[in-house]
């Protein structure tokens, strides 16, 4: 397991490192954007696996936890605030490798898809 996947919070530089490692098969994780649809469509980090808006958290949280409890999951948003809240909830409910992308997309200098 990649050492960055043991942290509670990672920086944008860390995320770029992990995305590059995942492309080479050296890291395994899910990258989940918790912003709203409109924000996502305006631009998102290349490599995001799924969009799970926080406004719909109650609808997707339980099944997401059941399906991904044992995986490393990195949550991202615009600044790291919403993703930090989501990460805290999942960590508190037994997802040991829930990770917050601290700083969010506004601090990310890697590839953005529109």
Language-model features and meaning:
Residues 1-30, 37-72, 81-114:
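Rhodanese-like catalytic fold shared by cysteine-dependent sulfurtransferases
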Residues 75-76:
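Short, surface-exposed ligand- or partner-binding patches at beta-edge/loop junctions that are enriched
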